[in-house]
Amino acid sequence: MPVAITRQVSPAIGDCELTHLERTPIDVDVARAQHAAYEAALAALGCRVERLPAEPDLPDSVFVEDAAVVLDDVAILTRPGAESRRDERPTIERALAPYRDVVAIEAPGIVDGG
């Protein structure tokens, strides 16, 4: 059974990084409902959803696909250009370690997933 790793929405998601979009307020309750629907869709497709807890101090951490590039045999932990994203790495590494060998991009390298 495929595994889908997700993370609950941070209460600080309204402070997330945006690079080119005009900011409109994010309704945390709506974001949580949308994320629950996303997880339900993954489960309906046959995935076992492994949900990580929210990271209250990491607004962007719900976007787990940015923290690693996962291939068949290895997971590559990214080193995002935004310093605010780099503290997401330890929990993603722990979540991926049971499923893949894990390697990491180190300074001065920069890789953004997604």
Located regions from the model:
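The feature marks the mature, well-folded catalytic cores of soluble enzymes
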Residues: M1-G114
